[in-house]
Amino acid sequence: MLTRVEQDATDREATVLGVDHNWRPTARWNIRSRLLGSRIDQAGDRVQDLGATVWADYEMEDGWRQQWIAMHFGNDLQINDFGYLSRNSTNYLHWEVRKRFTGLPDASRYSSKDWRWRVSSSHNNHGDKLNDQFRMSREGQLRNGSYEYAQINVNSAGLSDMLLRGNGVVRLPANFNTYFEYERPRKGDWAHETELETFTGGLAGNRKLGAGAGYTATYFISDAFSIYAGGYALYTPDWLVWQREDLVGGFKRRQFDLSAGLDWVVDDRHELRVKMQAIALDARVQHAWRFDPQGYALAATDTVEDFSVRNLGFQVRYRYELAPLSYLYVVYARGGYEQRTGTEGVEDLLQDSFRLRDDEQLVVKLSYRFEI
């Protein structure tokens, strides 16, 4: 794929090329490779670079599989003009073993289980180790139609070359995180989703434990009409937030996300959907840090202030089918974002978020299919 994007407002011209290759040398092997290149001209300057990825999957006996992945992204590779790249300057390797269990005893509540074990290593192009990781996960399909997923990541100590935004590196201690998700499909009038997580991180490493918990319930008034509501609470004891230069604040974060909505298929041609999400975040400073050239943290006397964030997104979306594959869309959207110095408490912030009205839009779109 070749793309070219011109942005007159920023005097930017981006050319990105991606070439994919898929090779199956035997029935058991599947090898996928991709070569990427970008050339960016902006304000009279030109940068260009390359990247490559290789995925190799091997099917073994009795449901066992192995996977190898290798990635390299150059320092100046930029593909976000046509896709998404979380970071450049990356060299990544991983090896994964999987086992799928089927044919479980009739007494088992599971119809199948997928276990995965993975080891990986990530470095930047300057030779700095970002981290090594061991991951173990299990995916389960239950006989009643429910779904489970559990995962644990154990991360080695390493460096962050992004936290200071070009002003140096940060040495981070070893940490871990766990995640659990459970989805129960509709049974009677109700469906349920639950999420749980625990984690460590920041400069505290494994000395401080954070946690998150979420729950969403869906009520079916009929097969065509359902409403849902849910929330997610998050506590982070050592949240690192860049301030300026090599100054970082260590915050205690409390956050709550609230979501609600409805889905109504009025008939074969009419559809109405309503979605709302509100976020309240309270961050209270615990430490101020600066970093030496090797990335070691030094206690700073700079003033770092508490802050709070509230955010709202609300949308009403109506769709009418004019003809097969031809639709009329009417969308009303409203929302806002505000960050303040100081703290107010998550409960007050969540209530205040419903008063946000920074943006308000009404969009009408017609999509019509013509036959020639």
What are these regions (language model features)?
Residues M1-W23, N30:
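Aromatic-lined, polymer-binding surfaces characteristic
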Residues A14, R34-I372:
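Exposed, low-structure sequence patches enriched in small/polar residues
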